[in-house]
């Protein structure tokens, strides 16, 4: 048998959060289309001659607001030092299908506070009494859990899944080439 709802509600603030549900699965047709796109871009990159200067500029324009490489950019999303070691296929997948492999540290959580306000960000640390939330501007907020009325977590990446349309194939190769050149030294 389970505990009464009133007891569960009182104990909830002392328990770890329930894991967020997995994102809605993409259809078989969409998964197949993305798999073909990733394979196509991976194969075509082998023949490309990426311009690393343009790739660097594309990183600054499209990626640095969330990602950091060698101290440049923001740490809102995953840190990318040594990203080049992932290889062409994995980087193509990460860029073209960002919801395929999302680390739980980068799920967006929206908190409704007891004072009626809401705040959103990424939970970076959580104890029995407090949690540390980093908002989408990169600011840290340590919140007492007893001031939180509710929490919703989106188990998807904030990275747009639009890079296949946002970048030309040449730009994609330039960005991919630059990312591949970023290896730990």
Identify what each model region corresponds to:
Residues 1-50, 61, 69-72, 178-185:
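Post-cleavage N-terminal segment of exported redox proteins
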Residues 41, 45-46, 50, 74-106, ...:
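Primarily the internal scaffold of c-type cytochrome electron-transfer domains
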Residues 48-69, 84-87, 175:
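Sequence/structural segment immediately N-terminal to covalent heme-attachment motifs in c-type
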Residues 57-79, 101-104, 117-119, 125-132, ...:
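Periplasmic/extracellular electron-transfer cofactor-ligation site
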Residues 109-115:
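A short beta-strand micro-motif
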Residues 138-158, 162:
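Structured surface patches comprising rigid loops and adjacent beta-strands/short helices at the edges
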Residues 162-185:
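Long, low-complexity intrinsically disordered regions
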